[in-house]
UniProtKB/Swiss-Prot annotation:
InterPro entries reported in the protein's UniProt record: Cyt_B5-like_heme/steroid-bd, Cyt_B5-like_heme/steroid_sf, FA_desaturase_dom, Fatty_acid_desaturase
Protein name: Acyl-CoA Delta-4 desaturase
One Pfam family recorded for the sequence: FA_desaturase
Subcellular location: Membrane
Positions of the Cytochrome b5 heme-binding domain: 19-96
Entry's transmembrane regions: 132-152, 153-173, 266-286, 307-327
Mode of membrane association: Multi-pass membrane protein
Catalyzed reaction equations: (8Z,11Z,14Z,17Z)-eicosatetraenoyl-CoA + 2 Fe(II)-[cytochrome b5] + O2 + 2 H(+) = (5Z,8Z,11Z,14Z,17Z)-eicosapentaenoyl-CoA + 2 Fe(III)-[cytochrome b5] + 2 H2O; (7Z,10Z,13Z,16Z)-docosatetraenoyl-CoA + 2 Fe(II)-[cytochrome b5] + O2 + 2 H(+) = (4Z,7Z,10Z,13Z,16Z)-docosapentaenoyl-CoA + 2 Fe(III)-[cytochrome b5] + 2 H2O; (7Z,10Z,13Z,16Z,19Z)-docosapentaenoyl-CoA + 2 Fe(II)-[cytochrome b5] + O2 + 2 H(+) = (4Z,7Z,10Z,13Z,16Z,19Z)-docosahexaenoyl-CoA + 2 Fe(III)-[cytochrome b5] + 2 H2O
Gene Ontology MF: a single term: acyl-CoA (8-3)-desaturase activity
SMART domains hit by this protein: Cyt-b5
PROSITE patterns with a match to the protein in the record: CYTOCHROME_B5_2 (PS50255)
Description of its domains: The protein sequence includes a number of characteristic features of microsomal fatty acid desaturases including three histidine boxes and an N-terminal cytochrome b5 domain containing the heme-binding motif.
Amino acid sequence: MGGGGQLGESGENGCKSAAGVYTWEEVQHHSNRNDQWLVIDRKVYNVTQWAKRHPGGFRVLNHYAGEDATEAFTAFHPDIKFVQKYMKPLLVGELAATEPSQDQDKNAALIQDFHTLRQQAESEGLFQARPLFFLLHLGHILLLEALALLMVWHWGTGWLQTLLCAVMLATAQSQAGWLQHDFGHLSVFKKSRWNHLVHKFVIGHLKGASANWWNHRHFQHHAKPNIFKKDPDINMVDLFVLGETQPVEYGIKKIKNMPYNHQHKYFFLVAPPLLIPVFYNYNIMMTMITRRDYVDLSWAMTFYIRYMLCYVPVYGLFGSLALMMFARFLESHWFVWVTQMSHLPMDIDNDKRRDWLSMQLQATCNIEKSFFNDWFSGHLNFQIEHHLFPRMPRHNYHLVAPQVQTLCEKHGIPYEVKTLWKGMVDVVRALKKSGDLWLDAYLHK
């Protein structure tokens, strides 16, 4: 799903029909890491070599190898015509006239209806951003950081001031997380290069993280949400079992890396407090170093240098590090609950190769709209709309939501909206249900 590449790969991979015309069966043979074909608008592309240079990461392309990637391609790329120019060297043919446009017996009527909805949203200007909206969000992040610093510089470093400072820093970090998400999805500026530049500033300078790390991880999540071996957000490194399939598989195989029937209890001790300050911090830094991503590493270092210059004079080195870790400890709770309540209680399974609309609705739910919920979640309380239209500016999610709901009702697809409290409670309930399934399979199967 990008541009540029090498021609001449197709002949070595076999299955080539006369005049570059292929059946779905032939395309599906090219579905491993060393041999990747995909279909976009009935045209067949060999992306085996290009995958290594794909700006969104090689894994995203691999996840769609042997499949129709039209809907994902459209969802992720803001300038389709521009990208298509660079795809020409990758073209190896097209589908035979007798072949359907969709693979895996997908519902053509549903796909067409969703395509019509996307076109309608574009014609209504729902993919156009309001710069002032994002400027104000950036402004309130910078204001929170400035107030936190001024407070301890002026009133000292007592326990109350330190606690308030940590809360303000955690709030700024959380809101910066939602803001970098906007730029990372290319949903603010018309030019991708400006989105990329500001993304590096927000995630690098304001948060000390890596834009490339986020891109390669997050686009996989959007491409195949809640799908094992494809969505990194559900790779729980054997700490948890999720959904209804994995627990039974682990139970039957007698895998007991953790007491999974108690995972809904130890979740509170592991995921919310440790995800950002421990796992993400380590993973991000190691990724930048091992991949020699010196650009992102330089951006991240500006965050740490700025932070130390601001806080070491008042807290000392150890105190400054402790304050940073405590702020990230608070931020981690915020981040985990917001992100998990929209996904973890939903369907988590192996890849069923569904159409875009069905796949996203199986994996996502919404949280009720309110001023607080919008701000608290970075408008990801409209997780359904965000997953269907990842490039849409978040201030327009609520405008397209009624049309999405109508389309779902037409095709009998559940469209779930919860209260904030129920969304959080359902995370724990889902973990308990999966843990119980594991225990039953472990003991009786």
